[in-house]
Amino acid sequence: MKCDEIFAALAMLEKERGISQSFMMEKIVQALTTAYKRDHEGVENVVVDVDEGKRELKMFVQKEVVDEVENPGTQMSLDDAKAISAKYNVGDIVNIPVDNIEFGRIAAGNGKQVIIQGLREAESGMVYDEYNSKQHEILTGVVTRIDPRTGNASLRIGTGTEATDALLLAGEQVKGETLVEGQRIKVYLVDVRRQSRGPQVVIPRTHPGLVKRLFELEVPEIYDGTVEIRSIAREAGSRTKMAVWSNDENVDPIGACVGPHGQRVNSIVDELRGEKIDIIKYSDDPAEYIAAALAPADVIDVRLAEEGKACRVIVPDDQLSLAIGKEGQNARLAARLVGYKIDIKPESYKEEE
């Protein structure tokens, strides 16, 4: 590429892609100096003068004026320096212009390649910055492909120039859901990782944060801070338990989340493909909180351990299986929700004591 072509290309990239000319020019200057050093062994100090007004690039090799030359790549004799200009003395630095033909050859061989590579780096950096600022937010993506072998889904996140591709792994999809190409789904942005092939956007649908953000979007009282989500325990695709608290005694936190005729919670259940959601009222009283967490089972008594976060819960005999849940799920989620180890016993066990 000729110099004027380089300037024209950078101006176009800044206008159409939003990539600054200074960023790209820095990449080009670095590539040109590296290429020259590679072709001229021993040369160390190479500078490129950028004249944006004249749309010119000029390359110089810098050498120090010395009495006795030991390294021709970095030094020049006083006589040679005086031949250029009588002003030079020992210790001065001389800028020796690189022949225009040679510089043109280097620019032609590296300019286009560097612009392409710099474009990739710049776009990669822009994608990283864009999505790194959206961590722990909900994004909407369109399924573009399903890998029939692994079940992984490729998604297009965002629109226009800000759109990027992301991979939703099979293990991070909601259990039991079947995704199809063209389907729009909500995902939760957990992390953005820098990788050689570009940023990796981590977007599971299994994270508890997805449920929290969905309620924030659906329930105005949560969005404005009147109702708080204190804790969430989730087994994606099956069941979620969520503890809520109201900062206004006139607002029922559970009712706010459920909504009129269950509209709010049902909307979220639909998004999560039928996942059951238990909403309980948070309490600062551990025993009361634990009892509520084991809903829908009734609790007769909660005995807290004297040390550590553990307890024994007594339930009616006919509700033992309900309290424990299928494959222990209800008890397991309750324990995670409240942060206590829970030992559930039937009422007959209490009588035997």
Residue ranges of model-derived segments:
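RNA-contacting regions in translation and RNA-metabolism proteins
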Residues: 1-353
